[in-house]
């Protein structure tokens, strides 16, 4: 007895693959990448110190991802090798965030359409622009915080689609409450502590349920430092993270005794 032939239209086939990939990405924890005055900030909820969801790719380029770890780790290492080869063969300035994002989009898109299983990943390629002159006193920052700075944020989805974001990127998990919270709090040109507190608060948002409180040990945080020369990627350790996350009033109180004990005078001897 022969088995009946089952036909699925190409549209249904692609819808099934998309749903499969989206469900896999949603099972992970969220990641936020946002612009701030000093560069680009990465904040990921990550309870495993041995596994990184945020990392360096090249001099002024960073990488963040959500979804299946082994799949985006393969993409990360491939991106590092590709960037190193291009920088060595041509010039380091030829390694740009736009070029790398396009390379990732082609690879992920091919896997989505040709392989048996699509990658359950969503990635962000971020590039920080060169140092810029200080903004004149009283001058407002740009509406989106990016024009004139050279900062770039690219989101590459599981199907290879690529979108350039102008303010922030949210990936993984149940991200609608996170996006809503960041849309409400985002300010162009905000400083690092303000941006960090807003990102962590957004990651703890759960919609109608009470917000979650995330500890510094549950976070992976890094920046692309605009003022740095050469490699700009810097990880923020848990001790410094706790200080940056402290409310402004608490931080001022903590700094007051140190200021009284160590007045601003030249060292003697």
UniProtKB/Swiss-Prot annotation:
Q: Where is this region: Disordered?
A: 130-150
Keyword Chaperone in the entry? The reply is no
Q: According to the UniProt entry, where is the signal peptide?
A: none
Pathway field of the UniProt record reads:
Protein degradation; proteasomal Pup-dependent pathway
Gene Ontology cellular-component terms for this entry are: cytoplasm; proteasome core complex, alpha-subunit complex
Q: Where is the composition biased (Pro residues)?
A: 130-139
Keywords recorded for this protein, A-Z = Cytoplasm, Proteasome
Pfam families given in the database record:
Proteasome
A Gene Ontology biological process annotation? proteasomal protein catabolic process
Give the SUPFAM superfamilies listed for this entry: N-terminal nucleophile aminohydrolases (Ntn hydrolases) (SSF56235)
How is this protein's activity kept under control? The formation of the proteasomal ATPase ARC-20S proteasome complex, likely via the docking of the C-termini of ARC into the intersubunit pockets in the alpha-rings, may trigger opening of the gate for substrate entry. Interconversion between the open-gate and close-gate conformations leads to a dynamic regulation of the 20S proteasome proteolysis activity.
Q: Which InterPro entries match?
A: Ntn_hydrolases_N, Proteasome_alpha-type, Proteasome_asu_bac, Proteasome_sua/b
Compartments reported by the entry:
Cytoplasm
A Gene Ontology MF term for this entry?
threonine-type endopeptidase activity
Q: What exactly does this protein do?
A: Component of the proteasome core, a large protease complex with broad specificity involved in protein degradation.
Looking up NCBIfam families in the UniProt record yields: 20S_bact_alpha
Oligomeric state and partners? The 20S proteasome core is composed of 14 alpha and 14 beta subunits that assemble into four stacked heptameric rings, resulting in a barrel-shaped structure. The two inner rings, each composed of seven catalytic beta subunits, are sandwiched by two outer rings, each composed of seven alpha subunits. The catalytic chamber with the active sites is on the inside of the barrel. Has a gated structure, the ends of the cylinder being occluded by the N-termini of the alpha-subunits. Is capped by the proteasome-associated ATPase, ARC.
Family that this chain belongs to: Belongs to the peptidase T1A family.
> What protein name does the entry list?
Proteasome subunit alpha
According to its UniProt entry, this protein's organism is: Nakamurella multipartita (strain ATCC 700099 / DSM 44233 / CIP 104796 / JCM 9543 / NBRC 105858 / Y-104)
């Amino acid at each position: 007895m022969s088995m009946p032939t089952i036909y699925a239209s190409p549209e249904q086939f692609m819808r099934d693959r998309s749903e499969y990939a989206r469900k896999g990405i949603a099972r992970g924890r969220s990641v936020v990448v946002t612009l701030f005055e000093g560069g680009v900030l990465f904040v990921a909820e990550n309870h495993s110190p041995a596994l990184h969801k945020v990392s360096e790719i090249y001099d002024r380029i960073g990488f963040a991802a959500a979804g299946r770890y082994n799949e985006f780790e393969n993409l990360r290492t491939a991106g590092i090798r590709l960037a190193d080869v291009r920088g060595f063969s041509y010039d380091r300035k030829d390694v740009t965030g736009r070029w790398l994002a396009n390379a990732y989009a082609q690879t992920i898109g091919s896997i989505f359409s040709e392989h048996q299983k699509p990658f359950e990943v969503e990635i962000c390629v971020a590039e920080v622009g060169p140092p810029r002159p200080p903004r004149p006193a009283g001058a407002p920052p740009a509406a989106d915080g990016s024009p004139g700075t050279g900062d770039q944020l690219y989101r590459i989805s599981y199907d290879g689609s690529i979108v350039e974001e102008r303010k922030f990127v949210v990936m993984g998990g149940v991200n609608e409450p996170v996006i809503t919270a960041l849309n409400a709090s985002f300010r162009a040109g905000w400083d690092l502590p303000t941006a960090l507190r807003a990102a962590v608060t957004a990651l703890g948002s759960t919609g109608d349920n009470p917000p979650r409180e995330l500890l510094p040990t549950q976070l992976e945080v890094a920046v692309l430092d605009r003022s740095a020369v050469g490699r700009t990627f810097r990880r923020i350790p848990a001790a410094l993270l706790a200080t940056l996350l402290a409310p402004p009033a608490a931080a001022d109180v903590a700094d007051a005794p140190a200021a009284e004990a160590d007045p601003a005078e030249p060292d003697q001897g």
